[in-house]
UniProtKB/Swiss-Prot annotation:
Residue intervals on the Nuclear side: 1-351
Gene label: TOR1AIP1
UniProt name for this protein: Torsin-1A-interacting protein 1
Record bears the keyword Transmembrane helix: yes
Subcellular localization: Nucleus inner membrane
Family matches, as PANTHER family: TORSIN-1A-INTERACTING PROTEIN, TORSIN-1A-INTERACTING PROTEIN 1
Protein's UniProt keywords contain rRNA processing: no
Length: 598
């Protein structure tokens, strides 16, 4: 018991209260150096001599007031001006009103000396305020709802916004606008000690001034508060009855529907008092002036540019209160919004001239896009008409001839631009159908190019059979190149088997599947077999094999040297694969006279 008493006394005295306990010392470890700043051998932390191996600090159960280090949290808090806030006693309503009245007159003191014009204006405002106090309007009832919104906004603006030497806080009374300025810390301590800590919320980087404005046709008070110079903003509106009570009542800002106006903090409202469009100016307005002013304000909000955010709505029962929010906009800017619509109209007119070339380009492109299929459709229709006429003239031909040839050439006409390869049609016949073969091949080629109103190119191999192979090759190349470059899109080559063997290699250039010189053209080749007649019972595959074997005999033999300009079996196979896209037989026509086509 004695040891415990000594430890309790040790705890109560001096700095031992603040010593932080440490872990116990193990057995066999040396004692620590003195911790009390002395050179004595006293054990550290004032431990008992009977228990040197383990230190223990017993914390007392007594309340913290015993140690003398307890202070109320309210005293430790500092006011915004760095002064201790003393505890306030509860006062009666009349005493509170006196304190607030004194706070009001303390706020009314400005930091700078007013100019003569401003001093005269302040006198006018004071005279008007005294007249308002003797008006016969009944006293306003205090609002049953006390919102924290005003206190929160004012406190956040106090901490976030730097002070400005310009007076921005103004209160719009029933017929006048009064300014509320910075108040000393003594008058603000009352509200600080009673109110709850406000909630902080992020604000935009651009420092703005929030003003609460109420417009009323019945002459109600309009509260306009600015919190850049004061830590707590208390908006009071008073009205006295000349016959009854002279007591002052304080109305909370939540009784009105608030309207926030954000303006630049460095803007001085006294410079805008001369502008009739600014509603927060300091001169007196009659009720007749408020009505057109409100109408002009609504007009500005409706004609404002799209960049400004405007929110309409929330009118009171008498439609006198307008709730709006304009972001980062000074009063001078809002007064210039009336001219926004003509400027936008001229801007649209200027941009309209820039749109004309674009519209013209789109129109021409769409015309080209839609006209090209129309041209192709017309070319196909013209080809179909020509083929139907030929079918009526040459009635001795097999139906396969008309169906296959028409489908093949129509597909080529309908193919997309540029076309991948030319259309190669090979017609063959026996000796009895030589005239029909000539006439029909020429007329089919002309039908393909009938839309262009040009005649197909005609090359006859019988006229070149005895000429040199290289010469024939050069002549054929020139005839085809010149004709196809000049707008002709079809060519007919008669008696392909009569050409010199080496000269036929030129058709690699015009009949290739991928690398043809002209791909939007049609070539019609004819081969006359040595047989007297060609049976109608033969299939297309058999007819194709007959033509292939016949050309192989005509163009290759054992005496032909192997060279690049002479035909050989390998070159013939390559040529055949290019000209044999479609091989069709032609039957003789009894009504056809020699040398005259139908």
């Amino acid at each position: 018991m004695a040891g415990e008493g000594r430890r309790a006394e040790a705890v109560r005295e001096g700095w031992g209260v603040y010593v932080t306990p440490r872990a116990p010392i193990r057995e066999g470890r040396g004692r620590l150096a003195p911790q009390n700043g002395g050179s004595s051998d006293a054990p550290a932390y004032r431990t008992s001599l009977s228990r040197q191996g383990r230190r223990e600090v017993r914390f007392s159960d007594e309340p913290p007031e015993v140690y003398g280090d307890f202070e109320p949290l309210v005293d430790k808090e500092r006011s915004p001006v760095g002064k201790r806030t003393r505890l306030e006693e509860f006062r009666s309503d009349s005493a509170k009103e006196e304190v607030r009245e004194s706070a009001y007159y303390l706020r009314s003191r400005q930091r700078r000396q007013p100019r003569p014009q401003e001093a005269e204006e302040m006198k006018t405002r004071r005279t008007t305020r005294l007249q308002q106090q003797h008006s016969q309007q009944p006293p306003l009832q205090p609002s049953p709802v006390m919102t924290r919104r005003g206190l929160r906004d004012s406190h956040s603006s106090e901490e976030d916004e730097p002070s400005s030497p310009t007076d921005l806080s103004q209160t719009i009374s029933k017929k006048t606008v009064r300014s509320i300025q910075e108040a000393p810390a003594e008058s603000e301590d009352l509200v600080i000690s009673l109110r709850r800590p406000p909630l902080r919320y992020p604000r935009s980087e651009a420092t703005s001034v929030q003003q609460k404005v109420n417009f009323s046709e019945e002459g109600e008070t309009e509260d306009d508060q600015d919190s850049s110079h004061s830590s707590v903003t208390t908006v009071k509106s008073r009205s006295r009855d000349s016959d009854e009570s002279g007591d002052k009542t304080t109305r909370s800002s939540s009784q009105y529907i608030e309207s926030f106006w954000q303006s630049s903090q460095s803007q001085n409202f006294t410079a805008h008092d001369k502008q009739p469009s600014v509603l927060s100016s300091g001169y007196q307005k009659t009720p007749q002036e408020w009505a057109p002013q409100t109408a002009r304000m609504r007009t500005r909000m409706q004609t404002s540019s799209p960049g400004k955010s405007s929110i309409y709505g929330s009118f009171s029962d008498d439609d006198s209160i307008l709730k709006s929010e304009l972001g980062n906009q000074s009063p001078s800017t809002s007064s210039q919004q009336v001219t926004g619509q003509p400027q936008n109209a001229s801007f649209v007119k200027r941009n309209w001239w820039w749109l004309l070339p674009l519209i013209a380009a789109l129109a021409s492109g769409s015309f080209w896009f839609f006209s090209t299929p129309e041209v192709e459709t017309t070319a196909v229709q013209e080809f179909q008409n020509q083929m139907n006429q030929l079918k009526n003239k040459y009635q001795g031909q097999d139906e396969k001839l008309w169906k296959r040839s028409q489908t093949f050439l129509e597909k080529h006409l309908n193919s997309s631009h540029p076309r991948s390869q030319p259309a190669i049609l090979l017609l063959t016949a026996a000796r009895d159908a030589e005239e029909a073969l000539r006439c029909l091949s020429e007329q089919i080629a002309d039908a393909y190019s009938s839309f262009h109103s040009v005649r197909a190119i005609r090359i006859d191999g019988t006229d070149k059979a005895t000429q040199d192979s290289d010469t024939v090759k050069l002549e054929v190349d020139q005839e085809l190149s010149n004709g196809l470059k000049n707008g002709q899109n079809a060519a007919v080559v008669h008696r392909f088997e009569s050409f010199p063997a080496g000269s036929t290699l030129i058709f690699y250039k015009y009949c290739d599947h991928e690398n043809a010189a002209f791909k939007d053209v049609a070539l019609v080749l004819t081969v006359l077999l040595e047989e007297e007649t060609l049976g109608t019972s033969l299939g297309l595959k058999e007819v194709e094999e007959k033509v292939r074997d016949f050309l192989k005999v005509k163009f290759t033999n054992s005496n032909t040297p192997n060279s690049y300009n002479h035909m050989d079996p390998d070159k013939l196979n390559g040529l055949w694969s290019r000209i044999s896209h479609l091989v069709l037989p032609v039957q003789p026509e009894n009504a056809l006279k020699r040398g005259i086509c139908l």
